Amino acid sequence: MTVNRKKFIHTLSFSLAALWVQGGRMLHARTKDDARISDFCRKLKPIGRALELPGYYVWCNSPIEAPDGKTHVFFSRWKADLGMSGWIKGSEIAHAVADAPDKPFEVLETVLAPRGTGFWDATTCHNPLIKKIGNTYYLFYMGNSNGKTNTKRIGLATSSSLDGPWTRTDAPILLPGAAGAWDDHCTTNPAWVRGKDGRNWLYYKSWNTHDYETTKGPIRGNRKYGVAFADKPEGPYEKYVHNPVIDFSAKGANRQFEDAFVWREGDKFKMIARDMGVFNHEVGLIMESDDGLHWSEPQIAFQPLSHYVQEPPAPAHLKRYGRLERPMLLLEDDQPAWLFGASQGGKYQTSSAFIFKCEV
């Protein structure tokens, strides 16, 4: 068979050019995809599940290091017979301790339980966030009074020791906005940080009631984040006039997020959270800011749980199986050292903590 040399060279050149273009596209796509993955995400090493408790769902695992070097966690739990939705109408906040984040945890006690009729936290205590500010431990949390979302309010308990006793505020420390405001439905998911101005900055999640009641689709309403400021951790808090500071609704498709944790790293404010459609519903988000008010476009903070571990197929009663929620950090010298999250599944097919080491 005779091959025309000129035709062969032309065909080869065209093929190489096509491969170069295709390769370029592939490289561009890979580079574009890689740009979505944060350095934080690349440094995560999965440790595994913790706080798998028989008869309970476990959620919202907030860690802190004690003066003796032990790791304490304040977490939400509710009876398994309430199902996954029991967090809204029967959650309590408990306390556990371990020699280190990757060692077994011992549950010590319930520290905050719903107080019953007449109290703002009558029906649930959830979303714990433990902080040491000065010589006092501050346990921020969300409570409600009717077992529904529209009475979710951020409150506070304080103690001079991680072992208590804990004194609660008589009223919430941050209330929803006026009717019609973007945040008129509730205040929840507290995230505290010391601002560059030395004041107490409290980030919170909320949404609009009308949107919540009229939105069609699997997720009702659009969750946004605002911030409020106070001279003291217990308040009174004054909301930032240009709230919300993070709002993904303009991206379309009801994109939103929740479960933010905020910290200061050098001159930057940083935030880690759970994605609700910006990339997908299975990953985490990470953002940064120079001033805590204007935030960068998000990158991926962590992958779906299946990226790190192989688990049994999802049981029918767990609809949010396979993803990490409620990300919380244990910091060392203001740097992320450990990531604590919550995930459905585990030994008792309820939910538990899931821990990562943040490798330097």
Stretches found by the model and what they are:
Residues 2-360:
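Carbohydrate-active catalytic/glycan-binding domains of CAZyme proteins
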